[in-house]
Structure formats: C-alpha cells, structure tokens
C-alpha cells in the first residue's frame, strides 16, 4: 500500500511538472483533455459560479453535445483554436453569457489562440478513433519535444494566424482587431495585457482540468501542496477574486469601445457605400436636372379643387384637347356642363355623378423646370381620413378657398373643412402652403380686391396660429375654370391690383426640396393592389431603390425583393429616388398580408416598431375632456390605428412649455400635455427628432380632429 501511494504521488508530481512545463511553453495540456467526461465534469464545473450564469450553457451541452467526448469533438472542430473560435471561444461565449468575463478582462483572445500552429497540428493528427496506445506514444513524443530548449517566437494573435475560419462571425473579427491594436504598441496597456496572459492561461487550463473527475483531486492538491505550484498558483486566486466583481466593469472597459468602434465603422461603411451607389450628377443627367414635387389640393367641398387640377393638366399638355372635349360632351349630356374639367381628376362614376371627390386622386404633369404629382384630396368631412393619407405624401399644400359669397364663409366657419385641412396638412409635415383664392371671376366677386382681402385676412390669422411661418404662406387670386392665374398671370385688365406670379410660375421657382437620396430607404405604403403579383404604392421618404433590391416590409419583418418599379406616368424605370410617388411590384409577400401603414425599409437600417410611446400632444378641439383610458383614432404617416391614453404625465405651460410636477387628472381643449399612448398592434414609428415624417400624428374622434402630436420617445 505504501509503495502504491508512493507511486501515485510520484506520478502526480510528474504530471504537475508536465503541466508547469506546458504552461511555460504556452501549450495545451493533453492530460486534462484525455479523460474528459461531460457528465462527470459538469457538477464540478457548476461549483464555480462567478455570476451564476453558466447554467445557460446546459452543462457543456453546446460544446460537445455529449458526442465523442472532449478530444474527439474538438478535433472535429479543427483543434482547440478552431473549436473554440467556432463555438465563440472561452472568451467570446463566456463573455456573451456574462459568466466568465473576469478571465479575459486583460486578454480578449482567451489564451487559446496563442497556440497557433504546433499544438493545432498535433491535435489534428489525433484523428477520430485514435487508440490509447497511439495517444500515449504521441504524448511521449510531445514530452520529448517539450524538453528541448524553446525557440523564441513572436506571439501571434488570432487576426494574424493565417487560418481562415469557416464559421467566423463578426464578433470574432471585432474582438481580434482591437487585440492587435492593444498588443502591438509597447506602452503600459499592452504590457499589462501580455503580463497577465500566462495567469489567464493557467486559470483556464486549471478549469479545463477541474472539469474532469480524474484531474479534480490533482487540481486541489496543486493549489495547496507543493511550494513551486503555490508560487505559480498564487496569482490565480487573485484573478479569481478579481473575476467575480469585474464582468460588468470589464464589459464597460472592453466591450463598449469595441462595439462603438464597430458600429461607427459599420455606419461609415454604410454611408460610403450608399454615396458610391448614387451620385447627384447621375440623378440630374437622368431627369435633366428636374426634381420632383408632390402638391396636394385641399379645401372645403365645392371650392373647385378638382376643376383646378384638371385645368392644370390640360394647360400643361398632360391631357390632350380631344380627351377634354370628350369629357365636356359627356358632362353636358349628364347635366353637369360646368364639371367637365373636374372629370379629368374624378374618374370614379360616383364622384362624377355627385360632383364630390371621394378618394385621393393622383395625376402627373411636367413643366420646363420640374416634375409634379397632383394629389386631389376629398373636401367632404366624411373623407377626412383619405385627405390625411394624401397630405402625408405631399411636399407643398395648395389650399383652395372659394371667393363666392356664402361659400367662403361655409368653408371657413366652424364645421367647414378649410380650417381642418390646413391644420392636418401642417400636422402631416406640409410646411409650405399656397392659398389660392378661387372663383374670382364669379359674378358675385368680379375680381374684387376687397373680397380678396377679406378672405385672406381671416385665413392668414388662423394659419399663423396653427404654426405656419409668415414666409411660408403665399396668397394669389385665380380662376380654376377659365385658367386665369394658373399657368399665365392674371390679365391686368381683369385684376389691376395683383401683379404677382401665377401658380405654376411660383411652383417652378420656389426653393428646391431637400432630398435624402443617399439616406436609408424608407417608403410608407399608402396603397396596395394585385396585378400578376403584389404591387404597393407610396412616396419614397428617404433613399433610393433599384430593381432587384432586397428590402424588408415592417412591422412584420418580411424580406422582399423589388421586381419592377413604375414611376408617376406608369412607365417602368430602373431606379426611383426620395420624393417620388412610385408603385413597386414586389416578391416575398402576398397582397392579403399587407395594409396601408406598413413601411418598406432598408434591411441595414429598418424602421422601429412599437406598441407604446411617449408623445407631446396639443388638444385643438374636444367637446368634453380626456383622461387615462381615453380611446380615439390615430393617423400616423399612412397608418390608421386605434390608440388609448395610458398615462397623462405632464401638463405644459403656455408659452414656456414648462412641465408640471404633478400629472394632470384630465386634459381639455387648448391644453398641451405629455402622455403615454398605446396601440393594439405594432406600428412603424420613429421619434419626431430623428424622422419627422414618421414621428408626427393626428388624433380624431367622432369625425373631428381633436389633437395633434409628435413622438418624443419610443417605449
């Protein structure tokens, strides 16, 4: 028995000496790997719990999956270096789980990647099904090679090893790059990293050995028995003490700069890539320097919006004379003789019979300087939701008011749509408005300057009150039926007191729109149809799109491919840019799975989706009061959703917008509040500060616009 215990002690001392030699040479200890049994080692591994999070691994289940044991599985993965890299490595996988960050706080590559060529070749030589005798023979050869004087070599990091990893992820790249930056310079940080490297390797080797039942008692004795081992093992408990509290700090020190630098690099690469794709000069050459402007005709019912739009199309040559004459004959036969120009815009039979626009009509025309899309909004209060959808796609608003006696008053007074349309246009981001005083040729008006001033004075005060700047409001007298003041200036004989530009003259010469052609692609879906495939339509708010581009449909995150692009004239084109009204034939989603309010977006920078958000809200019209639990309808870009007030957080003082300390119990007309709102389903939204077109909304209840708001925070 004494001889047996003596032999046992000698064999243990020999193994300890081998481990010390391997640690000095930075080599992996095959003894620990030889007898690894996952089922047995799991419980010992579980005793060490720096952050109690290694249970997520399922007990080495993700490493070996209990197939082939430690040695065989890691051989299959290409040795220790490849196996640990493919699995995320001790450093990566443990850091990701938050459990072993303390090990790698000074040396992110975790020690194993130092072994590079020799150990990997030796490990790869141990093929599947190697016998114990072959392994013992190879082990003795390895020990003999360890006894040779070591040749000093330059330490290689993972990034310089020259080995290509098939499953290497971005995380491997981002962690290896800062390592090379840290270790290549000679200052203190690099020195400390290299100095702590042996300690980290020893710690990891000990844990690998402790994971086997055979090596477990040896490890315990190593840390307490011989003096030599104590000298080397004393730093390890220190590392242990450091590792328990450090993971969070280590993550802040190391992970944050890496992720920040990686995200900055990614953002820079994305911007550069998109700037390379589209050049401003290419766009100018493609369209002859003409930019695109969407204009919306809005105002009270019977103000003359459709007639004016139809006349503009005729005057610019977008509709030929024969077509107009045909409409004139048909209108005369139907007893609607004066409506024939509006029939150019109102193509629906019901619209023509009633003389009311129901849907947002769309038409296209072009001048010498610009390309235009007309959005003809319905003026009846029953169709305000359609008007909101149209206004969300417009760049410039043309507010048509009738100068005819009685009609102006009806439209402007309470219950008329003139005020509401102007407010909704402002809410939807139409910041420039042209007030067109129509029907100036009417017998009750006769181009009267007094009547013109009466109309514009009242309306001007209202427009300034809802937020329009003085420079963004333009007034002009026109006749939509005769065409006076539309393309050519008004005849001085009829109107000697007005010498300003005509409507098209002003539109052609106003400031150029600021387009984000090279921004991330974003297009809210305003309509859909099925025509040998799924077709969506809308206005491109940001970026550009080409045939064959892969995009994502939010909020359901469906990947789609653009098959065909149709421009405003229904012609196929290869590319479409920010500001244009387009139809896209797409593949990857069915028409039934789509609805207006979805957003087609770039996969690199998708739009955010939420069910709850914080917003600043101004209540403009409310019969009673609203409080927590109040529900109404929200119009957000092209989306229409029911929304509920979850919490009224603050009341804002008039003038200063100072927040109240106590939350208000209710809100009423004229108040500004900050509240948390919730929708039933996911909606695509951004904060107003980041993307104004996706961060402003309108609230309606019982057929009335009760509030406008902007999103301040996504929750």
Curated annotation (Swiss-Prot):
GTP binds at residues 299-306, 376-380, 438-441. It is found in: Cytoplasm. InterPro entries: EFTu-like_2, G_TR_CS, GTP-eEF1A_C, P-loop_NTPase, Sup35, T_Tr_GTP-bd_dom, TRAFAC_GTPase_members, Transl_B-barrel_sf. Residues 290-515 form the tr-type G domain. The modification Phosphothreonine is found at residue 373. Residues 5-128 are annotated as: Several sort of repeats. Residues 355-359 are annotated as: G2. Residues 299-306 are annotated as: G1. The keyword GTP-binding applies. CDD domains: EF1_alpha, eRF3_C_III, eRF3_II. Residues 13-25, 39-129, 176-198 have a biased composition (Low complexity). One of its GO terms (cellular component) is translation release factor complex. This is Eukaryotic peptide chain release factor GTP-binding subunit. It comes from Candida albicans (Yeast). The lineage of its organism: Eukaryota, Fungi, Dikarya, Ascomycota, Saccharomycotina.
């Amino acid at each position: 028995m004494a001889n047996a215990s003596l032999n046992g002690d000698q064999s243990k001392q020999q193994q300890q000496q081998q481990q010390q030699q391997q640690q000095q040479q930075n080599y992996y200890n095959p003894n620990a790997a030889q007898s690894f049994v996952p089922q047995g080692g799991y419980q010992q591994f579980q005793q060490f719990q720096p952050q109690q999070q290694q249970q997520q691994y399922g007990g080495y289940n993700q490493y070996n999956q209990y197939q082939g044991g430690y040695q065989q599985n890691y051989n299959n993965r290409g040795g220790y270096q490849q196996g640990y890299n493919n699995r995320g490595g001790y450093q990566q996988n443990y850091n990701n789980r938050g459990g072993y960050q303390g090990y790698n706080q000074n040396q992110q590559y975790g020690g194993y990647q130092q072994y590079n060529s020799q150990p990997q070749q030796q490990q790869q030589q141990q093929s599947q099904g190697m016998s114990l005798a072959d392994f013992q023979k190879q082990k003795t050869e390895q020990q003999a090679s360890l006894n040779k004087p070591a040749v000093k070599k330059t330490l290689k990091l993972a990034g310089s090893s020259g080995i290509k990893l098939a499953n290497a992820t971005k995380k491997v790249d981002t962690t290896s790059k800062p390592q090379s930056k840290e270790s290549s310079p000679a200052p203190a940080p690099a020195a400390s990293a290299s100095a702590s490297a042996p300690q980290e390797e020893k710690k990891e080797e000990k844990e690998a050995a402790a994971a086997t039942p055979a090596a477990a008692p040896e490890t315990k004795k190593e840390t307490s028995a011989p003096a030599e081992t104590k000298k080397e093992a004393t730093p390890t408990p220190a590392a242990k003490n450091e590792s328990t509290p450090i993971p969070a700090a280590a993550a802040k020190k190391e992970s944050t700069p890496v992720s920040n630098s990686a995200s900055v690099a990614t953002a820079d690469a994305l911007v550069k890539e998109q700037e390379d794709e589209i050049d401003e000069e290419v766009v100018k050459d493609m369209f002859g320097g003409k930019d695109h402007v969407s204009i919306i005709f809005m105002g009270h019912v019977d103000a003359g919006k459709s007639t004016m739009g139809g006349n503009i199309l005729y005057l610019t040559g977008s509709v030929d004379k024969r077509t107009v004459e045909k409409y004139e004959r048909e209108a005369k036969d139907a007893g609607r003789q004066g409506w024939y120009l509006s029939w150019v815009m109102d193509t629906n039979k019901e619209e023509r019979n009633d003389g009311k626009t129901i849907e947002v009509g769309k038409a296209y025309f072009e001048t010498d300087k610009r390309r235009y899309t007309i959005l003809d909004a319905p003026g009846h209060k029953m169709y305000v939701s359609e008007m909101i959808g149209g206004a969300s796609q417009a760049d410039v608003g043309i507010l048509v008011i009738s100068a005819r006696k009685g009609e102006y008053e009806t439209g402007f007074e309470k219950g008329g749509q003139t005020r509401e349309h102007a407010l909704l246009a402002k809410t939807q981001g139409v910041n420039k408005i042209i007030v067109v005083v129509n029907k100036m040729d009417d017998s009750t008006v006769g181009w009267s300057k007094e009547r013109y001033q009466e109309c514009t004075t009242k309306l001007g005060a209202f427009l300034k009150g809802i937020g329009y700047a003085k420079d963004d409001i333009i007034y002009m007298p026109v006749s939509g039926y005769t065409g006076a003041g539309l393309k050519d200036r008004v005849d001085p004989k009829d109107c000697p007191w007005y010498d300003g530009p005509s409507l098209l003259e002003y539109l052609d010469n106003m400031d150029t729109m600021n387009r984000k052609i090279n921004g991330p692609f974003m297009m809210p879906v305003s309509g859909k149809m099925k025509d040998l495939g799924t077709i969506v339509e809308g206005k491109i708010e940001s970026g550009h799109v080409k045939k064959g581009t892969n995009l994502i449909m939010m909020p359901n995150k469906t990947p789609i491919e653009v098959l065909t692009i149709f421009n405003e004239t229904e012609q196929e084109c290869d590319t479409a840019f920010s500001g244009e009204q387009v139809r896209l034939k797409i593949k990857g989603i069915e028409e039934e799975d789509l609805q207006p309010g979805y957003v087609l977006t770039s996969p690199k920078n998708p739009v955010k989706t939420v069910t709850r958000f914080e917003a600043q809200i101004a209540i403009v019209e409310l019969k009673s009061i609203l409080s927590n639990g109040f529900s109404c309808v929200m119009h957000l870009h092209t989306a229409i959703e029911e929304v509920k007030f979850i919490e009224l957080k603050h009341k804002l003082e008039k003038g200063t917008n100072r927040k109240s300390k106590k939350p208000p119990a209710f809100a009423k007309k004229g108040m500004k509040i900050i509240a948390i709102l919730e929708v039933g389903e996911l909606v695509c939204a951004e904060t107003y500060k980041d993307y104004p077109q996706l961060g402003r909304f309108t609230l309606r209840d019982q057929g009335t616009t009760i509030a406008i708001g902007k999103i301040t925070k996504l929750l």
